[in-house]
Amino acid sequence: MDLENKVKKMGLGHEQGFGAPCLKCKEKCEGFELHFWRKICRNCKCGQEEHDVLLSNEEDRKVGKLFEDTKYTTLIAKLKSDGIPMYKRNVMILTNPVAAKKNVSINTVTYEWAPPVHNQALARQYMQMLPKEKQPVAGSEGAQYRKKQLAKQLPAHDQDPSKCHELSPREVKEMEQFVKKYKSEALGVGDVKLPCEMDAQGPKKMYIPGGDRSTPPAAGAMEDKSAEHKSTQYSCYCCKLNMKEGDPAIYAERAGYDKLWHPACFVCSVCHELLVDMIYFWKNEKLYCGRHYCDSEKPRCAGCDELIFSNEYTQAENQNWHLKHFCCFDCDSILAGEIYVMVNDKPVCKPCYVKNHAVVCQGCHNAIDPEVQRVTYNNFSWHASTECFLCSCCSKCLIGQKFMPVEGMVFCSVECKKMMS
């Protein structure tokens, strides 16, 4: 398929999750409606991950595409219908007998994801070492956390040009090369193993970048492996604390098997969130989630949340923007050369600011223009003028004078305050 056809096929998937309720805004949001180029709801401005959108198949497709053309093809299966790679997510179901007065009932716990290991006891141990609120039990807070991190850490628009907004053929080609590069140089999936088992495999099976660092025994020397095993101390690469004997650890092949992590310490070095499904990116001796690895390689547009592959883009307020996306957060009008105000780190044009965000003057009860001087005390504001910042009793101008605040009123003296009380 040539680049022009790829560009024509692009779309942000506006039908996905349409009308889903917002878990954050509740009834204030009319339901999810994807903005035509931002990755947010048009109604409440929250992300799709904040809405109760059923995306299990879509997420499995996204992760499946991430693992396509990598060494992790054992974690995907291609659908016969369309050939799209699907993530073979490992689901773990645990059954525990619960004693009742008459009969023994079975309590079933389903984990929406679990480490792909043959030893279920090891997988169970791994889960128990995660914070309770982050264990992906179906229908729980932990399952919602995993869903949110899948969306946040592994954005589809960081790997699939068809999920981006109006890329040029040149940008599509550059993005494909970028994705191919990080798949071959940085992408990995953690392994859950017991440290003593890894030690027993010996140095020949250890992956260490730059060669084997172990020192072979001298000729004729006897190795006391039992003594070596007893004295071995394993410490977590993140928190530096020792591993407890019998506890599982996570290894990352790209980091080398001389490094290991507690399950709860296998986190992104930037956002410090658990690496979802143990999917990591390794760079400069650090673990990253997909989002923050890409951020370390490319500028990201603060408007559309996509990586910038264009040679021309703008920088404002310590953020990067596609030229066409430096727009008012409220009305989407282009802001180049216009006056704007930052509201919660989002640029807003002057008319929208006055209409939707400006504070109201306690004196004249009109909105205060962002370019006009004002006086603020606690949550109250006034125009810094002789017409507005006045004593609430005698109308004396208080600019540059001492005053006594009482809720939304100000007084020049105790006498004036008493007269109004």
Curated annotation (Swiss-Prot):
All copies of the LIM zinc-binding domain together span 234-297, 299-359, 362-421
Q: Which UniProt keywords apply?
A: Cell junction, Cytoplasm, LIM domain, Metal-binding, Repeat, Zinc
Q: A GO molecular function for this record?
A: zinc ion binding
Q: Please name the Gene3D superfamilies in this protein's record.
A: Cysteine Rich Protein
Q: Record keywords: Nucleus included?
A: no
A biological process term (GO) from this entry: negative regulation of cell population proliferation
Q: Where is this region: Disordered?
A: 133-164
Composition bias (Basic and acidic residues) maps to 155-164
Against SMART domains, the record matches this protein to:
LIM
Q: Which residues form the PET domain?
A: 92-199
Give the domain section of the comments.
The N-terminal and the C-terminal halves of the protein can associate with each other, thereby hindering interactions with ZYX.
Q: Summarize subunit and interaction data from the UniProt record for this chain.
A: Interacts via LIM domain 1 with ZYX. Interacts (via LIM domain 3) with ENAH and VASP. Interacts with ALKBH4, talin, actin, alpha-actinin, GRIP1 and PXN. Interacts (via LIM domain 2) with ACTL7A (via N-terminus). Heterodimer with ACTL7A; the heterodimer interacts with ENAH to form a heterotrimer.
Q: Which family does it belong to?
A: Belongs to the prickle / espinas / testin family.
Entry function: Scaffold protein that may play a role in cell adhesion, cell spreading and in the reorganization of the actin cytoskeleton. Plays a role in the regulation of cell proliferation. May act as a tumor suppressor.
* Name used for this protein in its record: Testin
Q: Which organism is it from?
A: Saimiri boliviensis boliviensis
> Taxonomic lineage per UniProt?
Eukaryota, Metazoa, Chordata, Craniata, Vertebrata
| Gene encoding the protein | TES
